Amino acid sequence: MGLLSILRKLKSAPDQEVRILLLGLDNAGKTTLLKQLASEDISHITPTQGFNIKSVQSQGFKLNVWDIGGQRKIRPYWRNYFENTDVLIYVIDSADRKRFEETGQELAELLDEEKLSGVPVLIFANKQDLLTAAPASEIAEGLNLHTIRDRVWQIQSCSALTGQGVQDGMNWVCKNVNAKKK
């Protein structure tokens, strides 16, 4: 097989499919983030009652992103979506300091889930465009992220509204999609 035919085969190889679970409290910005990734209009977003799924092509991957509603009454159903998750993206509203404890508890519970064991996690410290937003470093410290040892993780400041930091986070996802620790 010549070099040209090898290159043709590589070029025509289908993108690796990746299942991404997008979670976080209600009003954290998950759906805005998903629409930003899909280059869709973000001017009119309503609370997600069930879930949204979008597929996005990125760096040789077909990212199937599952955006699950974050309202308290929906959270018990999150576990129905854990199976076969390749990457967990957890979105935090950096400007809503009153809910840091609640979001920290939810994240800790997710990290303890057996079906998500070893799954790489990206934490988006969202709404950095707001003056009241806590920096990602402060959130990481407050949530004791440095104690996470059973998986690769990253905290990324972003604004789903402006798009700032979103691509940096997704670059990390694509680099670490195969880093699931057994």
UniProtKB/Swiss-Prot annotation:
One of its GO terms (molecular function) is GTP binding. GTP binds at residues 24-31, 67-71, 126-129. It is a peripheral membrane protein. GO terms for cellular component: centrosome; cilium; cytoplasm; cytoplasmic microtubule; Golgi apparatus; Golgi membrane; microtubule cytoskeleton; midbody. PANTHER family: ADP-RIBOSYLATION FACTOR-LIKE PROTEIN 2-RELATED. SUPFAM superfamilies: P-loop containing nucleoside triphosphate hydrolases. A lipid is attached at G2 (N-myristoyl glycine). Belongs to the small GTPase superfamily. Arf family. One of its GO terms (biological process) is kidney development. Small GTP-binding protein which cycles between an inactive GDP-bound and an active GTP-bound form, and the rate of cycling is regulated by guanine nucleotide exchange factors (GEF) and GTPase-activating proteins (GAP). Required for normal cytokinesis and cilia signaling. Required for targeting proteins to the ciliary membrane by releasing myristoylated protein from unc119 cargo adapters into the cilium. It is found in: Golgi apparatus membrane; Cytoplasm, Cytoskeleton, Spindle; Nucleus; Cytoplasm, Cytoskeleton, Microtubule organizing center, Centrosome. Keywords: Cell cycle, Cell division, Cell projection, Cytoplasm, Cytoskeleton, Golgi apparatus, GTP-binding, Lipoprotein, Membrane, Myristate, Nucleotide-binding, Nucleus, Protein transport, Transport. Pfam families: Arf (PF00025). The keyword Nucleus applies. This is ADP-ribosylation factor-like protein 3.
